[in-house]
Amino acid sequence: MNGMRLVGIGDNATVLTQKARGEGRRNPFVSNSFKQANRLVLDLTYLFEAPGPGAIHRKDFDTLIPKAMEAHELLKENKGDIYDKGIPMTGWQDMPVRITKEHLSRIVESAQELASKIDAYVSLGIGGSYLGIEATIRALTHQYFNQLSKEARGGVPEIYFLGQNMDPDYFRDTLDMLDGKKVGINVISKSGTTTETAIGFRIMRRLLEENWGDRARELILVTTDPEKGALRRLAEQKGYNMFVVPDDIGGRFSVLSDVGLVGLAVAGIDIEEFVEGFKDMRERCMNDDFWSNPCLVHAVARHLAYQKGKKIEVVATNSTALYGVARWMEQLFPESEGHEGHGMWVSPALYSEKLHANGQMVQDGERNILETFLFLREHDNRVGIPMDEEDLDGLNFLPQNNLDMNFVNRMVVEGPAYAHYKGGVPCIVIEVPRRNAYNIGQIYYMMERSVAISGYLLGHNPFIQPGVEAYKKAMFALIGKPGFEDFKKEMERERLKRPRIKL
């Protein structure tokens, strides 16, 4: 039996876009027509007056706008509770206008040089040194990217991620995918001592050196502290090509820095277009007119929902490609807002898949939910629905009306938004016109500035994460890291006091 042929199915537009990038063809991202067609839209149609308890009213905005505008001015002036170890952590907000074409060119040249030598690229990092890179690549490439031919990938290597967890099976399975291939890596860590990433790097560095000896240094990029740290010392000793983790930008805000841009460039993504999206959203979010500023409106909408008793934010998308962006938001908001008993739990969801799982809870469960939709308006591909002579499933009305999967998938947002709103769930819709680097850049900047404003509204520093250090301290003690002996003894004493209950 022969293999299946895609009879009547057109070329995959995502693959065509990847090939175009590989040939140097670009979107006209500086043109006004492109920007108008790709303007991100914040839709509050289903936010106000949801039935039941905890409804948000327009007058609630009026009471909070003065405080939001004060936060807006403080943030613009780099004032307020924004410091980490004496450094103001707001370098991200002007990065779109500070980054130079020369620096972007250096990143692209280094990325292309490495990509030309390898079959597979491994990005090593965790948290903010991982999620934004993975989310952006996933958003802008074929969902089975590594299974495509190099030509279909646009001439770029396969892309893998390690150092983001400690699962030995995942790590070993990834090594199987790399076996027999020429591999390049980029290790991303400010200190070089982040446990998960450092262990992954140690293993990968040994493998590269075992295979290619001194030439391994040509296959290793390092993104780390500009002046100090264990990883910087090693990179200087070995002669690795280095990029910088900025001092004034925290990990979850770092996707526009070298942290994110190097990996995106290796994947063939147009980082100039990506920067342009950040830049244009920054311009909108510096606007002093509240209702013309999507970052301010978004921050106030979420804060009012929190004040009204919403403890869970479902971030749902109708796009598999954008699900990684929802996961990026899952770090950005809780790590910035989860202080002093504050904050909403962020739950990413892919619709319509999750509508057949937690959709019942959203519709009829406790009314402590805010729903945010990352709504992709136009997918890359238009997959037609064929007529069927028997029509046993009753779907012939779709092709009869020239309605395809793209249309049905749009209703996967519009239908649930209406139903959930009528069930008492306020909804925010962020309308993303198309899958391109410009739009992903817009989303990131809007979310970063929104969560910064949220920190001011909540009354705490959104740029630190002291709670994360608690798990690290306990883990270091348990694995026997030098310097944590006393804390390990304290943990053991505490554990002995507690009854061991195992079933």
Please identify what each model-predicted range represents:
Residues Q112-D288, A477:
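Glycine-rich phosphate-binding loops that contact phosphosugars or nucleotide phosphates
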Residues N211-E371, G467-L503:
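Active-site phosphate/pyrophosphate-binding segments
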Residues D11-V30:
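A short, charged, amphipathic alpha-helix used as a generic interaction element across diverse proteins
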Residues I312, T320-V432, A437-Q442, E448-I479:
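C-terminal catalytic subdomain
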Residues E109, P168-D176, A299-R302, F375, ...:
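Short, charged beta->alpha transition segments
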Residues R106-D119, T174-V183, V300-K311, V362-R367, ...:
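Glycine-rich phosphate/diphosphate-binding loops that line cofactor/substrate pockets in enzymes
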Residues M1-M4, A452:
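Short aromatic-glycine-(Arg/Gly/Cys) micro-motifs in beta-strand/loop hairpins
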Residues F34-Q112, E389-L395, P399, F487-L503:
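Extended, charge-enriched "interface" segments that sit outside catalytic cores
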